[in-house]
């Protein structure tokens, strides 16, 4: 009997170590990229990084793929009449492309359980099916940042709670923060925005802008029953090519 108990204890610890190791092998991160000079890059960019060291995988899932050759692209871009799609690239290529462009990249590692990480992977793989990967882009409500946020929330077993900011900005206020110094782009965007863009918006709506999403994620918590944990484990700058913070 004692031998059986010892064997069961050893089996339990062996399984525990296996599960713990499996969890440690997987890391999912929210990636936020600094703005570029093209109109579609003025606001920065958001993507998701999925790392599994046991499998040698390091992928970036990017909801910001599009064709710039689309007729009247800029007008359709702002009006929400452009089709975007989910693309997948290897992380070194993603990092290298932003380093060459001269844009810094921030990585926020998500505080997910192993089951949440696995669910997120399944959701991303489902999104990447040819029948699902293309979507109708909306400048404020359905873009690379909101898609990343929404799929993170779908994989979490509890609820993500964001801290409501004190400053109630409008869509136009935020747009102008990023179009400063790009007068013609700003004018073109302003001409496409309606009066709704001047109304104060809450924190969730402000997350259409990548760096507003970054700040919201930094303060967010995951609530499961009586348990509360931060959404972000830690943050670091993985591409550092700018003399000062762009935020």
Feature-to-residue mapping (PLM):
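Soluble extramembrane regions of membrane proteins in the secretory/endomembrane system
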Residues: 22-243
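Bacterial Sec-dependent N-terminal signal peptides
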Residues: 1-23
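Non-catalytic terminal regions of proteins
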Residues: 245-247
């Amino acid at each position: 009997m004692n031998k059986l108990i010892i064997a069961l204890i050893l089996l339990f610890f062996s399984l525990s170590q296996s599960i713990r190791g499996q969890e440690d092998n997987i890391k999912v991160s929210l990636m936020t990229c600094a703005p570029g000079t093209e109109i579609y890059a003025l606001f920065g960019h958001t993507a998701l990084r999925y790392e599994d060291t046991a499998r040698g995988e390091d992928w970036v899932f990017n909801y910001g793929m599009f064709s710039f050759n689309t007729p009247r692209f800029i007008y359709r871009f702002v009006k929400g009449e452009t089709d975007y799609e989910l693309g997948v690239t290897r992380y070194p290529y993603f990092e290298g492309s932003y380093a060459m462009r001269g844009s810094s990249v921030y990585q926020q590692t998500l505080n997910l359980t192993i089951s949440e990480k696995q669910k997120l992977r399944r959701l991303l793989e489902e999104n990447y099916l040819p029948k699902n990967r293309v979507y109708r882009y909306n400048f404020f409500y359905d873009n690379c940042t909101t898609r990343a946020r929404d799929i993170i929330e779908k994989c979490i077993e509890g609820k993500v709670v964001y801290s409501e900011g004190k400053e109630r900005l409008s869509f136009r206020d935020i747009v102008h923060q990023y179009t400063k110094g790009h007068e013609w782009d700003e004018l073109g965007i302003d001409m496409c925005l309606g009066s709704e863009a001047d109304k104060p918006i809450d924190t969730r709506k402000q997350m259409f802008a990548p760096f507003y999403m970054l700040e919201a994620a930094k303060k967010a918590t995951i609530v499961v029953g009586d348990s509360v944990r931060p959404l972000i484990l830690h943050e670091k700058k993985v591409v550092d090519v700018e003399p000062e913070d762009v935020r």
